[in-house]
Amino acid sequence: MELITGNCIPHIKVPELSPEEKALPYSKFYTDYPLYPPNPLQQQILDAGPMKVEDAIPIEHWLDWLSPAGYPKVVYGYTMMPDGSGFYIEYSTTAPTWQGKWRRWYGKWYNQHPAELPEGRGNLRYKIWNPIDHWDHKFINGENDKDGVWSVETLDLGATGDPSKGMPAVSHNIDLLEYGLSPEKKKELEDADCRVEACWEEFDGPGHHLVLRFSRPCPQGGRESLNCEWMGYWAKDGKIIRDEETPVDETYLKNVLMHNTIERAHLAQVLPDLYEAMNG
């Protein structure tokens, strides 16, 4: 991750766009919005090293902590688990002015390949979200996520300098009622305006990840999100399955947490203006 410093707020150097990409009307949302590193508090936590393993959420209790109030003991951190799998948790907030319709629109828009770009050049709509790591993203069936979502990203904070070299992956949404979430708990969460969803990812090569996303009203206004990932696990037929072939170590975990931290803040900066420009 190379920072541009000098007479400016330090920000991350991003790959140059192709002439075809620069010609697209929304390319300015890639070029004109600086990509910033994690804020100082987040960076301090990241640099302190892994969290205590006993403070992580074990896979056998992956849904137990979901509640309209209260927090896990640690809400931002990463660690290797005793069985060789990896875990991280990420806490973030959105401002009271944030509108959920922006994100719902973006989720459909960036999963459609731009007609103006030939296949193999990546997807600028997706690159806008995280220019140093994102390359391509699309619905497998071309219409929705029913059959899975295919993506390519590097998750190394631009270390390779070429996001197209990332490992392809396919994500599959799951119904949490089939994996231990009771109808009563689901109703309790919905009544409190909490949202929870999960998916598992399979990589083109060894590896599976299980992802849980949870958001609810923030006491200070807006919404707060708690997202977790268990690297080395996936889901099928109502069961959580261990994949011991999944490659993961502390460096990878830290990079993924930094990647997600950077892109979450960047999308909050870009998306309101992008939505207005494309839907105004």
Regions inferred by a protein language model and the residue ranges of each:
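Glycine-rich portal/gate segments that line the openings of hydrophobic small-molecule binding cavities
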Residues: 126-206
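Short, hydrophobic-biased amphipathic alpha-helical segments
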Residues: 252-270
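Short, highly charged C-terminal tails/helix-capping segments
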Residues: 269-280
